[in-house]
């Protein structure tokens, strides 16, 4: 947990799965390493300010504490289950999480 | 040639006009495309409010979908195309050209029933007045065959003959109606356009220009203080915004906090113009220079034309010089390389500025 004290996103590899973790107030969040918009690597484009995560690529934002979308964001973040035990962060990475990058509302469109 | 869609087969580029139908749940709009013209440029010419940011294959904002073998990919290795799902026919509007009459599915959030009043156009233009203003930095003028009405902060896409793709350049001047556009360009190793500019050879061949484009613009009726954080040639669009703000006497009522960064002091340019602006309303205008390499600066003996010089990156200097609440309620314009943009964006977000009040073009 000490590694998260400085704020921002930190990259970890858990059982071969890359995740990003951050701590906001008393909430720890663990997410896939990509923006749900266009798969931008958030370790480069993600900016944490207060409880807000911003992807600088197209300025999508989320509140990391409440998990709510903000501003231009059109898709929610997904989170790995995690918990703190004796000062260590435990992440349930039994299944790799990923985003569906297709435009859902276009899939049923009749050409 | 690479064609979007599942099957790649040899196809012949269209040699005549093609009819492209942009469609989604909001409607269908037919647009005639010139041979080889990008879908984005054709759509914008028609007044469609298509999604885009850079217009040059970099940002990936203009994703749409086409049917197999209908669209030629003008730049298969475009950085903005890295995440495209070819199996679903995804393409970049700015890098796709119709091979035949075809349909293009655009994101559902685009309202195809609306047409914009501001429609960019394509011009054959002449390049003039190249001046080297700093090491590896030059200014130049593009003369159009007719006048345009750009908004300050906008850019043009340009392509000299023989160059494959368009590149985006922000205007440094602002005139409500003009046929002379001024630009700044940085020398890029291996760059075709900058190579021509810095070659010293006569520039007598016309170039293709498309514009005006861009959404990182300034509304002269805006009543907010301005924050400008820029590095190197990223100052271009900000010079246009400052020119218009000065013209409407914005700084008699509102403040300007600006940091202009370069690696070394000899790399700055436009200093006479900035110093002149700073003198118009010294109580309201702060313009600082940030030097990221070399000896520490910051004492007044290092001032250049009355502009204070500080050592550090733009965001560091902006942070150290800003007072509490400096950015509250302001409107920010950023320009420069991606790492600088990200650092400045982080600074402003930390300061509580909403992203809707931070404007910049994503050219890189």
Annotate each PLM feature.
Chain B
Residues 81, 88-141:
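Fe-S ferredoxin-like electron-transfer domains
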Residues 115-205, 224, 262-263, 290-294:
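Ferredoxin-reductase
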Residues 237-249:
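Histidine-anchored nucleotide/phosphate-binding helix
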Residues 153, 234, 337:
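Short, conserved phosphate/pyrophosphate- and ester-handling motifs at nucleotide-, phospho-/glycolipid
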Residues 211-222:
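A short, basic/flexible loop-to-alpha-helix module at the beginning of a structural domain
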